[in-house]
Swiss-Prot record:
It is an enzyme of class 2 (transferase). It catalyses: Co-precorrin-5B + S-adenosyl-L-methionine = Co-precorrin-6A + S-adenosyl-L-homocysteine. HAMAP family: CbiD. Pathway: Cofactor biosynthesis; adenosylcobalamin biosynthesis; cob(II)yrinate a,c-diamide from sirohydrochlorin (anaerobic route): step 6/10. Its EC number is 2.1.1.195. This is Cobalt-precorrin-5B C(1)-methyltransferase.
Length: 370
């Protein structure tokens, strides 16, 4: 009889950033423009020196410009741009250097606070540098002394951008061309964390000294209801509360409101910076201990230890008149205060699934606005 063994999971596959796609397509288009060479694939050098070959969907000459396109391959990362067509159109210019233009599906910066100036196409610094280095190297090889106008676009990018933080950051009209290493690491969440940092930067640069960091839509709605806070000052942190707290060391605000579901706030109270279930779990013994500190008897503590969920434990305490929600928020507040500068006023809200507040700490209910 054949012995069955557990199948080993295959390693997750890395992909390439939109910045790498833009570099490959602009290089292919420029080469066609200057030498007449049509490419079906092109090799580029990533920022750390690794060489990669990228397949092209098209490479053609049209009137006074050349264009090339490639499909974004994010590997096994759940990237919103996976499978999108990234394209470049390149024209020659008399002045040396490279000038970037936002094509269809690539956004433009409309608010200060980002690394790019207002009015600039949302093509981040590393992709700009990658494209510039490749194009200037090509120009030197071919003896070309002029410059390039490079238009980068993403097919369907305007619709895809609505699934990102771009509209809230003031990047309108499409996606950003991103990447610092040129490689997409599966589930690294680097882009999400970068968007959290950008959100804080944009809010503070535009004069908002009170921000609310929220785990999801329900907590954002709660913050709007409590403070009538504008979207620009709402930071969609998801599970990455650590990204918010640590960034405030560099970019402090006057006031930080943290709002999330009771379970996630209980993880923060236990000292976790990443609230996702992959990295932290509900600690029922700790909940029982906190409940005991605010009046839970031994029988209720045992019930909490055998609860199926944190919400069930909270409901048990509510029925017994034990303010577990507030106690958890107090511990979350203490931990958050230990991370951010002492000058930052912090408050914490825990909510239920309907967005109702089930616990709070550090809250001066003056309804002050930003």
């Amino acid at each position: 009889m054949r012995e069955e063994t557990a199948e080993q999971p295959a390693p997750l596959r890395s992909g390439l950033t939109t910045g790498s796609c833009a570099t490959a397509t602009s290089l292919a288009a420029a080469r066609l423009l200057l030498s007449g060479q049509i490419s079906d694939a092109v090799e580029i050098v990533l920022p750390k020196g690794k060489q990669v070959q990228m397949r092209l969907e098209f490479c053609r000459r049209v009137d006074n410009f050349a264009e090339a396109g490639t499909l974004k391959d994010a590997g096994d990362d759940p990237d919103v741009t996976h499978g999108a067509l990234v394209f470049a159109r390149v024209r020659q210019e008399a002045a040396p250097g490279v000038r970037f233009v936002a094509g269809a599906g690539v956004g433009s910066v409309t608010r200060p606070g980002l690394v790019l100036a207002v009015g600039e196409p949302a093509i981040n610094p590393v992709p700009r540098r990658m494209m510039t280095e490749h194009l200037l190297r090509l120009a030197e090889e071919l003896g070309y002394s002029g410059g390039f106008e490079v238009t980068i676009g993403v097919e369907g990018g305007e619709a895809l951008a609505l699934k990102t933080m771009n509209p809230r950051l003031g990047i309108l009209g499409g996606l950003s061309i991103l990447g610092t290493s040129g490689i997409v690491r599966p589930f690294s969440c680097a882009a999400y964390i970068a968007s959290i940092h950008q959100g804080i930067d944009v809010a503070t640069t535009n004069g908002y000294r009170h921000i609310a960091a929220c785990t999801g839509n329900a907590s954002e709605d709660t913050m709007r209801r409590v403070y009538n806070i504008p979207d620009i000052a709402l930071i969609e942190m998801g599970d990455f509360v650590g990204a918010v707290l640590k960034h405030l060391r560099k970019v402090p605000v006057d006031k930080l409101s943290l709002c999330g579901g009771f379970g996630k706030i209980s993880k923060l109270a236990a000292g976790h910076m990443d609230l996702h279930s992959r990295h932290s779990s509900i600690d029922l013994p700790q909940l029982a201990l906190w409940a005991a500190q605010v009046g839970a008897d031994a029988a209720l503590q045992q019930q909490i230890l055998h609860a199926n969920t944190s919400q069930q434990a909270l409901a048990m305490c509510a029925a017994a008149g034990v303010p577990l929600g507030d106690e958890v928020c107090r511990h979350a507040l203490a931990f958050a205060r230990s991370v951010v500068p002492a000058t930052v006023e912090v408050e914490v809200f825990a909510i239920d699934r309907q967005g109702g507040v089930v616990g709070q700490a550090g809250v001066a209910l003056s309804k002050e606005h930003t």
